[in-house]
Amino acid sequence: MEKFTPSELCADIKIYDYKKKVKYDEKSLVIFEKTGKMITAGKECEGMLYALPANSIGFSPIVLGRVSDYTCAEKMLKQMLCRYLGKPVFAGYGEGLIFIHEKLNEVEMKAYFDLLYQAGAKNVVYADESVKGIPEGTPWEDVIWGMKNTYKNLRFAVEITKEQPMDYLRYSLAQLAENCKRWGLEEEYNKRVMEMK
């Protein structure tokens, strides 16, 4: 199977600060020492992934819009929120919104709720692309900023998305080809691919 880098598979994370009215773009990337200590998280990892320090590992804890490593995702989100919103006060960061573009099941949604609570949110609101009453063609960024009108106490939002969805498509097709080969359906797979051309 074609090799994919953590940068290609990682989710893009956008953090919206409703107080300052600023949006920050991040990547779901982490670099850990093999002892378990996190070296860094987010965009800072991109340049380091190809020349990792000795005894360290780099990967994405959120892949294809889903949490693939809960503990690392929690540490990553804590660091990102602290970086952009400051250290949480005694009561935490207040109310947070999680906006996800992927279709998730209940268990996957709960993982995101738990992540935000563990990262310091006092309350968590969930939204996805099925939000009602949005005029067609409205950019998702405007929708997320506008959620403050519905949820007055929102302090921040975390959007899980993918700026280059073609990376996900390439990965999914490579996975499908690999599975078809394993299942003895390689010929059928190739036939279907030819039909699509």
Regions found by a protein language model. Give the residues of each.
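Nucleotide/phosphate-binding catalytic cleft detector across ATP-hydrolyzing
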Residues: 1-25, 32-37, 45-197
